[in-house]
Structure formats: structure tokens, C-alpha cells
């Protein structure tokens, strides 16, 4: 009788152990891979500043980010503070370091070799044109931070006018003869003249900027020298409007304009 009790106890212990194994999380240690997404520094004329659009992940209609590990791509969701989680996550298993590629937008899990920006960026098209990437970053278990960088150039317009009644609210700014625009070669800027443009060099003698005033007068600016727009760079455009037309001066900015429009 005592021997039978010992046998029953042993069988019960094995059964409970097997149930525990079935319910254990995937991976050797069961740890789910989560990330915190930040941004890489931007180097412009010796300056070291944070490269951000709005300094966090707020305001996104589409919050799906692509994460690639060992050739497998999974969708992760990013919150306003950059925390990345997934309903079908990766697991650490027995690894202490992972090599990660990532990009935004998710684009059905396929990274565009060259980004394509929206033609009308006066509304949501501006944010929809902000392509981000992480390229082959080694991430240790102890610090799951990944650093995104912008793939485009940000154009920021600084308007001044000697004409009465001319302001950002009543002029239309367009950037012309651009590559990799979703429809055509023209980008309509935001209400404050900002735009995201695929990195490229535009040659001297090219019509680059069109400004339409409230009275429907339209002025076009032709580049006097080659204009190089690099990845992750913010380029300032000082636009002066007068009775005689427009004058444009370019300058490098030390950081991206983080305002909402």
C-alpha cells in the first residue's frame, strides 16, 4: 500500500511538470523581445543634436514599425514614447545579443530601397513622408534601445515679406523638379513651407521653388548653383518676398524643426 502511494505521487509529479513545460513561454528564458525606439544624432557643421521630427512618436496615424531579426520581419507597434511591442514578438531564447534592422512605415514588411514622398504635404502627407530606418544594429539583452534615423531631407522655410498681408497663412509654396515623388515631380509644402524630400542633388539652372501670393501672383526661383540634399539633413530656405519678386538663400540647420506643421 505504501509502495502504491509512492508510485502515485511520482506519476502526479511528472504530470504537473509536463503541464508546466507546455505552458512555458517560447525561448530558453522565455523573454520577449521589446525595444525602445530613439533617434540618432545629426551632424551638421560640427553640431551634435538630436534628429527628430517632433521629439517623440506622437501624432502618427500608422503606428506599425517593421523589425527584422535573422531575416524574419515582424510588425511591432510603437507608442508615443517609442516603446515597441508586438502581438507576435521575437524571443531572446539563448541569445544575449541580437542584430536588428528596422524601418518605418511598415509597408507590408518590405523596406523601400529608395523612399517615395507624398506630393501634397500640406496635410497628413507631411508625416506620411517621414521614412525612418535602423541599419544592422547590435542590441544587447541588457539595453534594448534601437536608434532610428531619417531617410529624407527636411526643408524648412523662413518667410519675410515687405508686402502687406503676405504671411504663411495665405501663400502657397511648392518645391519643383524633384525625384521620387509619389505623383509627379512637385511637392506642395506645409502651411509653414516645410517639406520632406528624398536625398538628391538638383543642378544649377533648375526651377526649384514656386511661390503663389494671395493676389495670385506666382514667382519661380531658379537655382544659381547645385543644391545637394543629404539624408537626415535639415536645410533652411530663407524666402524674401517683395514687390520685385522673391529672393532665396539656403543655409544648413543644426536640427530638424520639431513643430507640428
Positions of predicted regions on the chain:
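Bacterial N-terminal signal peptides
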Residues: 9-15
